[in-house]
Amino acid sequence: DVAKAFAWMHSNIADKDGNPNQIFIAGGSAGGHLTALLGTDDSFIKEHGLKISAIRGAIPISGLMDVSRVGRERRKGIWGDDPKIHRAASPLYHASKDAPPILLLHAEHDTADRRKQNQEMYDTLKKAGHPNVTIHELKNRTHNDIRPNLVGRNDPGGRLILAFLKKHSAHKGSLPKKQK
C-alpha cells in the first residue's frame, strides 16, 4: 500500500535526519500510475491521518492515467469489470487544483495512448486550475529505457527531475522538531 508506506516515511523520516515536509513521490510505469493516483486522490492519504499537502511533489513517469483504456483482459485481471472501480483507480478523474506540484514525464516511444493519457492529465489539471503541473516527452526513449536513463550523466529527464525538486523544495533551514 503506497499510502501506508508514505505515511510511515512521513512519521519516521525525522528519526533519520530527514524532513517530513520534503517528501516527493515518484514512480515509473505501474509506479507512475500509483504516484499519480496518490498525488491526486486524497482519500488514500487521509486514511493515514495526512492531507495531500504532505506530498511535496509527484513525478509520475510513463504512468497510466485512465485504467479503463487498458486492454479488457488485463484490466479485468487487475481491476475487475466495474466501471466505478476503473474510474476510482484512474488519476485523470481525481485531478484538482489542490494536488501537489506534478511533473509528468513520458517517453517519445511510449504507446500513443499512454502519451495521450499523460497529455490529457496535464490538460485536466490545468483546466482544474492547478498552478504547478508540467509535462515533458523525453525524446529517443522507450517505455522500458526511460527510467534507467534518468540517472545518466546529463540525461534530459534527470535534469528535469532535479530542477523540479529544486523548484518545489521547502526552505533549506533547520529540520522541524519531532512531533509527539
Label each residue range with its predicted role.
Residues 111-120:
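Conserved alpha/beta-hydrolase "acid-adjacent" motif
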Residues 1-5, 121:
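A general structural detector for well-ordered alpha-helical segments in enzyme core domains, enriched
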Residues 29, 108-110:
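Residue-level signal for short, function-critical loop segments
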Residues 98, 104-106:
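Short beta-strand/loop motif that positions the catalytic acidic residue
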Residues 105, 119, 126-180:
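C-terminal catalytic histidine-bearing segment of alpha/beta-hydrolase fold enzymes
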Residues 4-74, 86-87:
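Primarily recognizes the serine-hydrolase "nucleophile elbow" in alpha/beta-hydrolase
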Residues 79-94, 100:
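Active-site nucleophile elbow and catalytic-triad environment of alpha/beta-hydrolase enzymes
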Residues 63, 106-108:
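Cell-envelope and extracellular/periplasmic
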